Amino acid sequence: MKLVTSKILLTTTLAMASFSAFALKDDTNQPINIVSDNQSLDMENSVVTFTDNVVITQGSILIKANKVVITRPPENSGKKETVEAFGTPVTFHQLLDDGKPMDGKANKVHYDLGAEFLTLTGNAELRQLDSKINGERITYDVKKQQLKANGGKSRVKTVLIPSQLQQKGKK
């Protein structure tokens, strides 16, 4: 029982690392706090589910969702945890190392810790100050630091504020 509980706690910790891809370096050293109206743990399948008014904080990171599911694969599978968050929408806020805020939202957020790959699906948006990108699907490869956006049946919309881009170059 203790071993399984420890594994789930480790999974939760790793899950928070997923949202730390953009965050302050110090955020990953901060305590992870998860508050929800309900929580369930499936020890046999190594799945922990948080539902209703889920709020996750770690340092400058703030995530709000209707539901968060963290799945840990079998020990010898060679795979790592996945995190899925669902909401209307899921929102997240964090500060970057340069002190600027990064905000995002989507109906579904999926993070594969093994691949270090983040997918925002359904009315996805990433915003930094007044610059933003909107699409049906936005993916971010953390290792390669590559972002891609797809508009689905619509087009991807990007708004860049030149003065904010110039300020970034000065820092």
Regions found by a protein language model. Give the residues of each.
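Mature-chain termini and adjacent capping regions
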Residues: 1-171
